[in-house]
UniProtKB/Swiss-Prot annotation:
This is 3-phosphoshikimate 1-carboxyvinyltransferase. The gene is aroA. SUPFAM superfamilies: EPT/RTPC-like. Its EC number is 2.5.1.19. Gene3D superfamilies: Enolpyruvate transferase domain. It catalyses: 3-phosphoshikimate + phosphoenolpyruvate = 5-O-(1-carboxyvinyl)-3-phosphoshikimate + phosphate. It is found in: Cytoplasm. It comes from Bordetella pertussis (strain Tohama I / ATCC BAA-589 / NCTC 13251). Pathway: Metabolic intermediate biosynthesis; chorismate biosynthesis; chorismate from D-erythrose 4-phosphate and phosphoenolpyruvate: step 6/7. Phosphoenolpyruvate binds at K25, G96, R124, Q173, R356, R400, K425.
Length: 442
């Protein structure tokens, strides 16, 4: 798939089968960093093989961490507590799950580092995290536009003068980065570390993932709801010995959606009713749209209408603040709804791999949908009968755009996905797995 300029999707009629999900991107990169910061050795299984995890692995090796060879999703990391390499230039691609947490960890350890990424990474805000780290005395310099990467880290005087405040309304990754790095500073300073959230915290389930994983590495965080988080002065990460990565719940959304519009059943394995990922809640969105959803330990299954034969999903008006990534799948499913659909509270889309509100608006209109959008909302009216249009779908160098619009193959229009290789960020084999579930239209 890598290197292909485009992929013409075969017109699809039915979907059924089972998919073993790749490892969660959010969990994979968190666990890699936690294992590096922990005492002892951690054997990680089920690790996602993707651009973002390869970026994190390369950075850890560059920082002096002993990282074993990755084989079949397994890798062993020897924890170092403090990175041996105190001067480095790190290229972190477009991986926010690597850039933000590494920025915090490096800033609180001391040293001299330069962090950069692809041009889009330099358009994704990091100012709120930098402002919070500067409250600890961290020396951080913007090497381009203020508030954005690239960054130079070093030259500060780290201290703890009281609670540190961080804005929560732009990205939950800023709070995640501070939480994960806080035990490093607590140990160094001998003081409790308190982080206070300013504004409305978005994407709360991702913070739950962070707290859950920190606990598995031996650090429990005291919290006052979503307003304040305290890490004790004696907090120390300790490797759990062995750590299995859950399947990616955001990726599960595309396959569960296939079951909802292609009859099904489609079952995903690797996530289930006991998942720590908030995006499993997308299954409830599908149920509200009329799909039959079933859960078990380590699996979720959907059955639904056959939109290629005239079936329709129920329209929705929903707040997607808690599951912004999976919400993109809902936006594409709106093509098959029985009325206009509205997605609210999705302002975080603006600062993802691309401006996803603008990108989704543009590409849905190409297919004939009526689309309106604002700062943090999107409304999609499905194409009128006879109103579908053949389209070349731009993916905007965004893996989720490519995967979402694979669902458009169930409509009557011819669909071409441009730059399908962008799925390598999280799921290089996506289109092969997708094709294995489909029955084509005659």
């Amino acid at each position: 798939m890598s290197g292909l300029a485009y992929l013409d999707l075969p017109a699809a009629r039915l979907a059924r089968g089972e998919v073993a999900l790749p490892g969660s991107k959010s969990i994979s990169n968190r666990v890699l960093l936690l294992a590096a910061l922990a005492e002892g050795s951690t054997e990680i299984t089920g690790l996602l093989d993707s651009d973002d995890t390869r970026v994190m692995l390369a950075a850890l090796r560059q920082l002096g961490v002993s990282v074993g060879e990755v084989a079949d999703g397994c890798v062993t990391i020897e924890g170092v507590a403090r990175f041996p390499t105190e001067q480095a230039e790190l290229f972190l691609g477009n991986a926010g799950t690597a850039f933000r947490p590494l920025t915090a960890a490096l800033a609180l350890m001391g040293g001299d580092y330069r962090l950069s990424g692809v041009p889009r990474m330099h358009e994704r805000p990091i100012g709120d995290l930098v402002d919070a780290l500067r409250q600890f005395g961290a020396g951080i310099e913007y090497l381009g536009q203020a508030g954005y990467p690239p960054l130079r880290i070093g030259g500060g005087s780290i201290r703890v003068d009281g609670p540190v405040r961080v804005e929560g309304s732009v990205s939950s990754q800023f709070l995640t980065a501070l939480l994960m790095a806080a035990p490093v500073l607590a140990r160094r300073s001998g003081q409790d570390i308190t982080i206070e959230v300013v504004g409305e915290l978005i994407s709360k389930p991702y913070i739950e993932i962070t707290l859950n994983l920190m606990a598995r590495f031996g650090v429990s965080v005291r919290r006052d709801g979503w307003r304040a988080f305290t890490i004790a002065r004696d907090a120390v990460y300790r490797g759990p010995g062995r750590m299995a990565i859950e399947g990616d719940a955001s990726t599960a959304s595309y396959f569960l959606a296939l079951g909802a519009i292609g009859g099904g059943p489609v079952r995903v394995t690797g996530v289930g009713e006991d998942s720590i990922q908030g995006d499993v809640a997308f299954a409830a969105t599908l149920a509200a749209m009329g799909a039959d959803v079933r859960y078990g330990p380590g699996w979720i299954e959907t059955r639904g209408v056959r939109v290629a034969e005239g079936g329709r999903l129920k329209a929705f008006d929903a707040d997607f603040n808690l599951i912004p990534d999976a919400a993109m799948t809902a936006a594409t499913l709106a093509l098959y709804a029985d009325g206009p659909c509205r997605l609210r509270n999705i302002g975080s889309w603006r600062v993802k791999e691309t401006d996803r509100i603008h990108a989704m608006h543009t590409e849905l209109e190409k297919l004939g949908a009526g689309v309106q959008s604002g700062a943090d909302w999107l409304e999609v009216a499905p194409p009128e009968p006879g109103g579908w249009r053949d389209a070349h779908i731009g993916t905007w160098d965004d893996h989720r755009m490519a995967m979402c619009f694979s669902l458009a193959a169930f409509g009557p229009a011819a669909v071409r996905i441009l730059d399908p290789g962008c799925v390598s960020k999280t799921f290089p084999d996506y289109f092969d797995v997708y094709a294995g579930l489909l029955a084509a239209r005659d």
